Amino acid sequence: MRECIISWTLLLCLSCVKSFNLDVNAPIYRYGPSGTNFGYSVAEHFKGDKPVMLIGAPRGESGQTGTERAGAMYACDINTFYNGGSNHWCEQVRFEYENVEDYAKRPNETRGRTVHPLGKNDQLLASTIVSKGTKNGSALVCAPLIRYHQTAAYPQGACYELESNLRLQSTYATCAQKNLPTTDRHNEYGGCMEGFSAAITQDTIVTGLIGAVKWTGGVFAKKSSANIFDSVVEKYTMNQPNGDMIRTRLVAHDYLGYSVDIGRFGFWYEDGKPITVVSGATRYGEHGAVIFLPFIQDSSSKLTLNEDKFIINGTAMGSAFGYSIEVVDLNGDGFDDLIVGAPFEHRSGIDGNFGGIVYVYFSQGVQRKQHESHLVFHPPKILKNPDFYSQFGLSITKLGNVDGDKSKLNDFAVGAPFAFDGAGAVYIYLGTKNIEKFRKKPAQVIKGNDLPNLPPGGMRSFGFSLSGGSDMDENGYPDLLIGSPSKNFVALLRSRPVISIETKHKMEKRMVDIDKGVNCPRGAKTCFPLDMVIYVDEETKRGAELVDFSSDVFMCNLEAIPFRADTTARGFIEGSHSHNYSWPCGSNSHVQKRTYRQLIYLPVQESKDWITPLKFRFTVSIRNEKKPVQPPQGSQLVDLKHYPVLNKYGASYEFDVPFNTLCGEDHTCQTDLSLKAAFKDIPLTSNGYVSNVGEKDYLDLTFTVENKKEKAYQANFYLEYNEEELELPQVQGSKRMIAETIGKNIVHLPLGNPMNGASKHQFTIQFKLTRGRTEGIGKALKFMAHVNSTSQETEEELKDNKWEAEVQIIKKAELEIYGISDPDRVFFGGKARAESELELEEDIGTMVRHNYTIINHGPWTVRNVEAHISWPYQLRSRFGRGKNALYLLDVPTITTEFTDGTSEVRKCFIKQQYEYVNPAEIKLNTKYSTQETAPHRVEHRMKREIDEDEEEQSDDLGAVEENIPWFSTANFWNLFAIKGGDGRPREVKHLSCQDNTANCFTVICHFDFIDANSAVVIDLRARLWNATFIEDYSDVESVKIRSFGKLQLDESQGIDDDPNNNAAFVETSADPDRPTIGDSRPIPWWIYVIAAVIGVLILSLIIICLSKCGFFKRNRLDQPSLYTAQLKHEREEWADTGL
């Protein structure tokens, strides 16, 4: 419960710091007429000494006869009359004529410069409003599209200088008043659009004319003086000779005058009265630029570039660099700084996507010489907004000293009117004495949708226009006026008073002793007292009288935070035994410093890193802080003096606490670690480290780590290795060193914390090579080791902190492939049947199985092996497709018997399988098929039985006749049929893939691995296509049909294998069945005589034997031929299966 209270207190503190002092709880609103773009421009102004809000509505009605949507300006008092309908809401100011009666006349009927009869329709009056923002100060209001001339309509624009009471003082229509040529209309000065932008200071007025000379643009400036004897100086860029510098640098559509301002930055001529006019040219060079125009009080009216034509260019095409500019002294050095907006510049990077960029150019603070303009500014500070379509930088305004800092530095605001899905936002940035400490992170973010009591539909385009720097409620702090023209809405955000509190810390010792803590809590490695000090700054006590310091008015919070992003928070606070602790504080801190002691300790589990300091954040907030509430329409304003806040950065303080590392006077540990390594019993050859592994299946690596200098804190050793090829390592010879594994393939050994200077560690790490199915593919073994610590080492000393090596492991595995035919001899004969007559597989012919056996004799497992078997499925024919030979019935299968007693059956792969495996779709007898299975346990024969079976299989595939019984019919007829009638031997035919006598396809059988001392069997089941052999080979002695198998190994495994036994063939002899095939060859007469005699003798013996056995008492079936009997027998077997 206590931790929850602390967490909520911290959250409250953080939210208070984030909000800072522009109040969003009780803003002053103004809602304008619908469709008028009320809020398109805003200005903080004083009528005499009375503050008012000047608000432009350029699509409003001016009230002049004969005009439509001419525009209007409203002056609004500081009150809570938010909506129209009340006399206290706002006053529409009529200022275009000295006599208000002229509003009753049509534009072309009034005195003065001739205005086109429709010249004030849509003139965008009050689209630009600027004010000096001081008591009794004047203002400037412009209508850039007012059109002059009786017959032609020239949008030359005009600006109206108003006195403090908003009465017309002067009118500026430079292109018309100076009679600049308009013969070529907009290509000259017929469309100047004066007043598109404007700026005003105590003695200078500047206007922008972006339409001059085909939108090349222009700038007009007027400087006057309170001294009536000083002359008024007017200068402008327009109507300069063609050779003028500004005409040579700018071209059509550069939009000079898009934004304007005045300042003194440090150019050589700014000594005394001269100033510099700055203007944005948003399409200059397609990327935009800021143009600098010296204003020197002389008789010339020419406003042009300085001697070295100094310009600041944008960096991105289409960024509109210079869309908005603001001149303000941010660091109080007496020289103005420049803020430039590029709202359409987009950036994307590893830190995100950004829409709109603002450049802050700090002056160097030095008066430069001629031709040194490039030295006037520092490189810019770049502000970015993470909302891609926000148009961050569309508006910028100075704020004055909004945070009330004692240096009285100016601050500024940036508008992003389309941030947060179009609602809009305003970002507050604070000035700084030290340019390097300028904070790019905003001190406050004001979101349009966060304002209270908004109408239905929420906010849109909040921040489109801004005006700041004036104290509108007279509480001593400047306020901010914000326009939202999409909603015809304006909000005045007032500043809350600031109590400037300062925070710091004190310690008895500058550093923390690692092992010398006093009165530490149980389980702590070390501890130390930490004093936190708070006090109210004496120079800024104007907010101190607003709170009661007789009691603890503040809430203090101390938090241990990470030193860097890659570290964690360390250090526990005894008050809460956690990283975070809060307590009431601050009584009498306005008159004296208050100190609060906290005991900080480090538990043993966090006591490893003694180099990285501890880091803390100390935060102070107002206890039980109250927030103002927006009053209802017409109620009294909330007095923000009763709602002070603490200063943004003084109330939050971060600091480091280092450890005493006992490393010299500077307490910086300069260490020098050295790493050496060597393989045991593996020599280094010209090809690197090469090891032939056999019975020894491990590697030994010996490492030596030495520290040649000061203490190495958190010294560690890391070794990366191939986890697929090596098992978990073991440290040999050092019981004190315990290895741990990081991830899958990194071993880590701590070397000491610290590892003292002049010390050495020597240890051996043993890796066992992986065997079996998890074994890797045999790439070179890579070892990468390095040592490091949190102490410091130079780049030269770091060179020997790493070690790398590769070892090529050569593994022995003896693969062998051999094959057998089952049966090895078959017969063909009978009647040749067409394919369409075949229904059952037995109708095709005799079944033949080719079995290939692959044995891994070890000692290593082999992975990624393929057997490629060439299968003779057709006779070779010059016409392409030949007659069927060995007709493959099933997809070949692989039977694998593993060393753990399990086995499984899988299928091989045949490309275009349906063309080669039973393409005639003849019904198969499943009795003969080998089915796929999952791994299962099988009974294994003894090795002696296997050897006996192997001995029975002849290696001489040509001598298959030895396995045929001597009394078979085929053998008998072969004895007499070896020679033909002409005495020549009968022919023996061969069908094989190697000699191109058969059409073949390839069967691919893939093995993920073959264990050592294990075997796999490939079974190919086919039938001899009887019709083919009857038709083509009836007159031959025998047909030798041969398939061929070859092993392919993955060479990347580094396996040492003898390739001589990686190929084999299987041969089947197909012989004619003589009794069923007519033999037209002549037989000698003496053979008939011998055969008859022998036949009579045999028949007589058989009859005698059978008669004695009672054989003739039973019915006898006629004797079929061998071939017919064989097929009948197979049919009966199939019938027995019930199919």
Swiss-Prot record:
Localization per Swiss-Prot or TrEMBL: Membrane; Cell projection, Phagocytic cup; Cytoplasmic vesicle, Phagosome membrane
Cystine pairs: none
Phenotype when the gene is knocked out: RNAi-mediated knockdown in distal tip cell (DTC) causes DTC morphological and guidance defects such as precocious dorsal turns, a failure to reach the vulva and a bloated distal gonad. Embryos at the comma, 1.5-fold and 2-fold stages have increased number of cell corpses due to a defect in cell engulfment. RNAi-mediated knockdown with mig-38 results in enhanced gonad DTC migration.
GO CC terms, sorted: cell projection; external side of plasma membrane; integrin complex; membrane; phagocytic cup; phagocytic vesicle membrane; plasma membrane
Domain of life: Eukaryota
Transmembrane segments: 1085-1106
FG-GAP repeat feature ranges: 21-85, 111-171, 180-231, 242-302, 307-370, 378-438, 448-510
Positions on the Cytoplasmic side per record topology: 1107-1139
Keyword flag Zinc: no
Membrane topology: Single-pass type I membrane protein
Residues on Extracellular side: 20-1084
Function: Plays a role in cell migration, axon fasciculation, and morphogenesis. During gonad morphogenesis, involved in distal tip cell (DTC)-mediated guidance of gonad elongation, in maintaining their sharp tapering morphology and in their migration. Involved in the anterior-posterior positioning of QR neuroblast descendants by regulating the migratory speed of QR.p. Probably by acting as a receptor for apoptotic cells, plays a role in the clearance of apoptotic cells during mid-embryogenesis.
Family: Belongs to the integrin alpha chain family.
The protein's assembly and partners: Heterodimer of an alpha and a beta subunit. Alpha ina-1 associates with beta pat-3. Interacts (via cytoplasmic domain) with src-1 (when phosphorylated at 'Tyr-416').
Name the record gives this protein: Integrin alpha ina-1
Native source organism of the sequence: Caenorhabditis elegans
Organism classification: Eukaryota, Metazoa, Ecdysozoa, Nematoda, Chromadorea
